[in-house]
């Protein structure tokens, strides 16, 4: 049975990409601080949220897909931050791999990315990565909450949300 939540915040796993074989035993696992902050911000105004920490749970893409299907979110948000300044860019490859996998599996929820890399290069990120529908500028707190107010994710509805870049078919 699906839960029908508003948004799932995903902390992507790129440990094998960063640490290669060392990740089997020695890779660090960061607390999903940014996912927790964003989730609580949305929860505090009445939205039903979930956090999926694919890094801590060491979930495969297939396992992640199954969990997302059970949650049945309106929106999927990849939180590509870290406590290290460079970790946003470092974690992008794992996040993009998973978002592409989900799009190829016909998960229909819009995919949002928030993080230091997409803040620095919002339009370039959308141009290069076709699996991403929306990127948030700044920390994403207010823009995500404003996106959650929208029932139908069309150009007309998204164009008035401040602090985002988004894809409308092939236009950014």
Over which residues does each language-model region extend?
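Short glycine-rich His-centered loop
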Residues: 5-27
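Glycine-rich beta-alpha loop elements in corrinoid/cobalamin-binding modules
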Residues: 34, 38-42, 50-172
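Nucleotide donor/acceptor-binding cores
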Residues: 3-5, 74
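Secreted/periplasmic proteins that engage bacterial cell-wall peptidoglycan
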Residues: 30
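Short glycine-rich hinge loops at helix-strand junctions in the catalytic core
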Residues: 46
């Amino acid at each position: 049975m699906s839960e029908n939540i508003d948004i799932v915040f995903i902390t992507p796993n790129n440990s094998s990409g960063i640490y290669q074989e060392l990740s089997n035993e020695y890779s660090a696992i960061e607390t999903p601080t940014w996912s927790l902050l964003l989730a609580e911000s949305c929860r505090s105004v009445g939205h039903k949220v979930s956090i999926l920490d694919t890094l801590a749970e060491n979930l495969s893409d297939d396992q992640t897909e199954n969990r997302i299907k059970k949650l049945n979110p309106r929106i999927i948000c990849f939180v590509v931050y870290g406590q290290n300044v460079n970790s946003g860019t470092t974690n992008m490859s794992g996040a993009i791999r998973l978002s592409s996998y989900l799009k190829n599996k016909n998960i229909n929820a819009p995919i949002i990315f928030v993080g230091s890399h997409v803040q620095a290069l919002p339009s370039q990120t959308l141009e290069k990565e076709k699996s991403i529908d929306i990127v948030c500028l700044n920390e994403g707190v207010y823009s995500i909450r404003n996106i959650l107010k929208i029932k139908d994710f069309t150009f007309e509805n998204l164009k008035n949300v401040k602090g985002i870049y988004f894809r409308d078919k092939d236009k950014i």
